[in-house]
Amino acid sequence: MKIWRFLLMKKQTRLPFDNLPFYNKVMDKTAIKKLISRLIDHFGMTYTSHILDQLKTSGFKQATDTAISLGIDDLLTAPSKGWLVQDAEQQGSVSEKQNHYGNLHAVEKLRQSIEIWYATSEYLRKEMNTNFSMTDPLNPVHVMSFSGARGNTSQVHQLVGMRGLMSDPQGQIIDLPIRRNLREGLSLTEYIISCYGARKGVVDTAVRTADAGYLTRRLVEVVQQIVVRRTDCGTVQGIFVSPIRGRERDINEVVVRTQILIGRVLADDVYINRRCIATRNQDIGVGLANQLRNIRPRPIYIRTPFTCKSISRICQLCYGRSTTHSHLIELGEAVGIIAGQSIGEPGTQLTLRTFHTGGVFTGDIAEHIRAPFNGKIEFNENLVYPTRTRNGHPAYLCHNNLSITIDGQNQVQNLTIPPQSLLLVQNDQYVESEQIIAEVRARTSSFKEKVRKNIYSDLEGEMHWSTNVCHAPEYVHGNVHSILRTGYLWILSGGIYGSGVVPFPFHKYQDQVDVQPFVAKHTDSYVDQVEHRSGDSNCYGKEEQIFSYSETETDRTISNEHRDSIYVTFSPKNYNMKGKKQMNRFIVSLQCDKEWGKRIIPCPDAILRIPKSGILQINSIFGYSNVEHGIPDGPNMTTPFSLDLSREGDNLQIQISNSILYEDGERIQVMSDTSIPLVRTCLGFDWEQIDSIESEAYVSLISVRTNKIVNNMVQISLMKYPPFFMGRRDNKASSNLMFHNNLDHTNLFSSNGASQLISKHQGTICSLSNGEEDSGSFMVLSPSDCFRIVLFNDSKCYDTGNKSNRKDPMRKIIEFSGLLGHLHSITSRFPSSQFITDKKVLSKKHSIFHNYFMDENMRISHFDPCRNIISNLLGPNWCSSSSEFCKKTFPVVSLGQLIPESVWISEDEPLPESGQIIAVDEESLVIRSAKPYLATRKATVHGHYGEILDKGDTLITLIYERLKSSDIIQGLPKVEQLSEARLNNSISMNLKESFENWTGDMTRFLGSLWGLFISARITMEQSQIHLVNQIQKVYRSQGVRIGDKHIEIIVRQMTSKVLISEDGTANVFSPGELIGLSRAQRMDRALEETIYYQTMLLGITRASLNTQSFISEASFQETARVLAKAALQGRIDWLKGLKENVILGGMIPAGTGQHIHRSGKRNGIDPRIGNRNLFSNKVKDILFHHDKVSFFSIQENYHNILKQPLKES
């Protein structure tokens, strides 16, 4: 009301009040600024100051009368907070599961967590404002939060909403949010995290304030001599500014940039339909700016401090209007110091702010396109490509404009998705109203920085990967690899043990050992000190018990108590055989006695007994004897063999006969020239101890031949019975004898039927996959590293054989499961209407195969003993189909397959954890525990394939881009980086690329000489504009508006120096000397000799140390060096700047007190008419005022093209 009464009083003075608006509303800080600006335009500075004094007095009086205070009852929490927090926790739980399954890596999980909780916090803040407005609009907390004073909604939100996300001392966001507010109180963990943010705010206030003050000093230092000294410099150059900028918040919303035009001066006439609406050198006000915005779609040519010709000064028209009033800047104004203070002051003041939530995680990065109504979405799938979002969600990327159609119940709408956008829905998917269907990339990218995130292994085991990797270029000879495309890295569980500590002779692939004593026991045994004493053999030396079967150490005799097991005997010369690896075979060292049971058996060189269902290849097992380094008789199973004692020249090869002995001595000729593998045989040892129970140790050999590579496995277990239960024979000539091997959790690879283990801590040795023979260590799979899952408990298969077969349970389909191969002996086990096939039932009347074999490469082959034919039966992925009696099908699994967690491969429950299939039974699988890790493209892998890693080792290093915080506290280093022209900023990196692009285009039109010349100039002008935009982006992110002309003055000084090159400068300037650009141009025109130089982008510190005044330089930095150098060079300081005159106590060359008669003409140019010789001035300016110019035909055509738009206008 006081403002209105004041306006009525002034109305009597007959001032034009017709266009004055009537303000009758609550006004915040922004509205007050607009009001003051309008008051200055209409009344001037004097009257406006009186009005503001009355506003100030009225404001203090009303605040004193109201006496607003805060109480704890005024802190009201929004009722929707409970379900908002619960929903955010549920989303976080889903992200945690996806990370555990390997679908998200740690960085994507962190991004999701931060965005979820930031969105929850922001939504709760909006709910807080709505709650106050509806329930208690005069709440003191609500009134203070919108007063524009010290408090704001962010601080009130921490009182009544939720504290939200905090930052650690390094400025990184902590992914654990504070769910409570200060009214509810904090838990211990939340209090500690809250102290991080509070401490960061206190430290930043102290440290950043000094940094901002020093930045202000450097900015003022570099531009202190810039003063307005003339009205018009006569330049015809400028920059183009578009009054309209495209889509920002919404694709249909046009954001108008009229503020950039207000206060500027036109560099050229503006025409619309041959009608001039604005002339050159005319300043732009609010009315003209709105007019240009509405009717001028093309960019507007305006004057800028970049192109002012005044040397170390600036003119009125290149600067434009003053920021304090609506007139041109006055002569004598020290605009340089004003520019430095305008940029540095917001940084000094805004360091008092503490934003703990980090404004980077808002929706400003990308725009979202939402569905207008419910319906089905349709688009062309051939125009999109699958990809992943920054949060790990699947999406489609479109490179060009994509047209999508939303078909609703009663309406159809077409939308166009811009290029490089992400489509978040699938084709023919039903979408709901307001559902996000696409994400449009922002036109202007935010500040980003590359960050390395290390992923550590959660368990001990062996590294495998399922994606393409290559050597990183900087680590060609190391173990660092680079990911070529997104894939998984697996850590297969297993423990690594050193064989130098544990004396074990058979630490080879698939050995079973006792894993419990590894961590507690140690031995120092002597292998070469064994003597024979009265039939007993003992090892002398310091020895502790390592394995469970090491207690039986006397009179060990080879025994073969069960049929169908292979045993090797040697001549009774008491040779001690050494272990020797030959042709990928492992040889077991044995000794023999002449007695077997109660009979005396002759010992030929080699006798092999093999079960009828097994197949043996000729000359596949060799025995080696070393006569020179023989060891006396005695068992040495508990001591490691010294492989160095065996030399190739001393080895005695024992040939194996070409016949196989059956149980009754029946001779059957072995088929020659075949690739028949030895599937499984048994070596039995009967260890008799004097004062202990009778026990046996069985050594099982598994040999699988795949692609001409033979893999061997040795299994050692201490049992009371052989590891396999053998079925009886009804016919000697039949081949329907089958093994039965079920798996239990105690010993994963032995029978749980008749065999009972004495040791309960059995483990299996797993060879290293990298192919390196490491005798110092080996990996052991303990029972905790593997688990068993039952596939189908109630699956039934029916036999069509005779009645005697049906009565025998062992005559059913019994599948032998090896660790690397399967031997299936089937005799009429399927009806003629069913057979094992690839996911479907074949037609009837198929022949029944009796034997088939599945090798390591998951290839199932058929073997016919009569014809000796191996045929490929099924593909890599196989399953068995049931008949009408068996309704269920087996899942498609294969040996070595890596299966993620929660995959349904069983009818009872999903897979409890991720793993690798290492054994397949008819109704169960043995799975080795594993952990998948997602690795994106260009990530770094530390280690080789098959390398053993401990828990906590660095596994992957992810390289990703992180948005820098838009907080001014974090933004000040960015402003400093840009102002100092550091080498790693985007401006310096883009200079060379921009120059090369412009050179290629200009050379085609103007030739090589002028192409390079103009390209260098255009590149520098573009870098200047880009540098201004980058600095503005930091301040505008916090709502701080700084005039572009202030930053342009700073950038002008940063680009005002050139570097003299070495060509042809011996008589003029020294090579490498920094001089002013205007000085180089004047000297080039005055001298006949051409001066070669290149433009430079200097930082504000370096630019301050390269000025014309050595007094100013010495007062800034490096005083002794600057003064000594100036004395040696004989420099003269002409005291043209403000700083040097202040130091010496002289009169400063600035001030606006002088009176100047203003006329309608400036330098003989009427601003209403413009310059008639504008084109000639432009041509001279392009050539840097070169007088001697020879034009070629290409140049003449270029200038003719330039003349055309001017003639038309």
From Swiss-Prot:
Per the UniProt entry, the Enzyme Commission number(s) are 2.7.7.6
Q: Does the keyword Protease apply?
A: no
Q: What class of enzyme is it?
A: transferase
Compartments, as annotated in UniProt: Plastid, Chloroplast
Kindly list the biological process annotations in GO that this record carries.
Answer: DNA-templated transcription
Q: Which GO terms describe its molecular function?
A: DNA binding; DNA-directed RNA polymerase activity; zinc ion binding
The protein's required cofactors: Zn(2+)
Q: Which UniProt keywords apply?
A: Chloroplast, DNA-directed RNA polymerase, Metal-binding, Nucleotidyltransferase, Plastid, Transcription, Transferase, Zinc
> Where Zn(2+) is bound, by residue?
C233, C308, C315, C318
Q: Which reaction does it catalyse?
A: RNA(n) + a ribonucleoside 5'-triphosphate = RNA(n+1) + diphosphate
Q: Which PANTHER family match?
A: DNA-DIRECTED RNA POLYMERASE SUBUNIT BETA
- Give the similarity note: Belongs to the RNA polymerase beta' chain family. RpoC2 subfamily.
Q: Mind telling me what this protein is named?
A: DNA-directed RNA polymerase subunit beta''
Record organism = Pinus koraiensis
